[in-house]
């Protein structure tokens, strides 16, 4: 799109993000010290739509200008209380084994297997409030002849509202990154581990990019940047691998790739088809211990990530594979934030 942004095409969970941290602990400790890993996940983040930390966490993002819009100003205290929390829906924090087949100089890692922490979450309640407010503004300004495109209503970046949304969206990007930073630092501290390398990337965002000689606003909802040489993480499900990838810069896809496996069925269908207890028992047989989760997030609700990766081999190259071993998600029935 040229010169305009579509708030709803960015999405409710603005700047939802993946972050992978490689730790200095051997993979064998995932079994040998399971209780320590469990306590680190349970103490290091909170799940649920209204989840907060008992004591607000410190991060430089809270010193940024939150007065860029009325919504961000009014929601700053809520955002601070939710800093370092994970929310609901398909958001997770998990430990697993990262398999790197060959030396990667950018990661600074030799070939081998590593213990790693992977998280998926975004800008929490404040991001949702920004989306709701500016999507409503965009719809109210939509010419009548386009009324059938209500959820694709746009804001011109030459307008005050468009500039406000753009500033708020970028603040939410910084806030989402800070969320993951707080989670990973706290979890690794509770674990007594050192972070030796990492990869992160976000989706549900809009970027100003040059394509075909024109500046465009590229919206990636459910997609992630995959520019030439750009590192990222593409997850599967709680029982299937995630992949560290390096973008190939495919112009036809606007330098983009899928941000995950994607669902094969709705949450309602998953709850009707699967019982959580049976799924949990099956996962344990496969070596995956799930601390908390809901039936709507079972592996069967998702597409085959291996097939998805084969289908986008022209978009990204696989660098490493992450296999989940200890998983935590929301299990309190909260409305999905993703």
Identify the residue ranges that each predicted region occupies:
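A domain-level signal for the structural core that forms small-molecule/cofactor-binding pockets
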Residues: 10
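Domain-length cofactor-binding catalytic modules of enzymes
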Residues: 3-7, 15-18, 32-52, 60-338
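Short glycine-enriched, charge-decorated loop/helix-capping segments at active-site entrances
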Residues: 25
């Amino acid at each position: 799109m040229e010169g305009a942004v579509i708030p709803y095409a960015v999405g409710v969970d603005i700047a939802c993000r993946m972050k992978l941290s490689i730790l200095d602990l051997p993979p064998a400790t995932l079994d040998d010290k399971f209780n320590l890993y469990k306590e680190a996940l349970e103490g290091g983040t909170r799940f649920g739509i209204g989840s907060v930390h008992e004591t607000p966490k410190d991060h430089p993002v809270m010193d940024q200008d939150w007065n860029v819009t009325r919504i961000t100003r009014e929601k700053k205290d809520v955002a601070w209380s939710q800093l370092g929390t994970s929310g609901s829906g398909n958001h997770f924090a998990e430990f697993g084994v990262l398999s790197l087949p060959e030396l990667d100089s950018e990661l600074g890692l030799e070939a081998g297997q590593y213990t790693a922490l992977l998280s998926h979450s975004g800008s929490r309640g404040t991001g949702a409030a920004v989306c709701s407010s500016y999507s409503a503004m965009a719809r109210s300004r939509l010419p009548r002849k386009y009324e059938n495109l209500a959820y694709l209503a746009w804001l011109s970046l030459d307008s005050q509202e468009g500039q406000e949304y753009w500033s708020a969206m970028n603040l939410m990007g910084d806030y989402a990154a800070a969320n993951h930073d707080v989670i990973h630092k706290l979890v690794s501290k509770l674990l007594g581990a050192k972070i030796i390398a990492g990869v992160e990337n976000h989706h549900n965002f809009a970027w100003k990019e040059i394509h075909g000689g024109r500046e465009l606003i590229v919206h990636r909802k459910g997609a992630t940047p995959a520019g030439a040489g750009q590192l990222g993480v593409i997850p599967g499900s709680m029982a299937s691998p995630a992949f560290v990838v390096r973008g190939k810069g495919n112009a036809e896809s606007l330098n983009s790739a899928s941000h995950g496996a994607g669902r094969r069925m709705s949450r309602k269908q998953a709850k009707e088809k699967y019982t959580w207890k049976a799924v949990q028992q099956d996962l344990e047989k496969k070596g995956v211990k799930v601390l908390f989760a809901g039936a709507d997030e079972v592996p069967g609700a998702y597409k085959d990530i291996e097939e998805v990766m084969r289908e986008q081999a022209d978009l990204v190259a696989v660098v490493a594979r992450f296999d989940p071993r200890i998983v935590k998600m929301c299990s309190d029935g909260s409305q999905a934030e993703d």
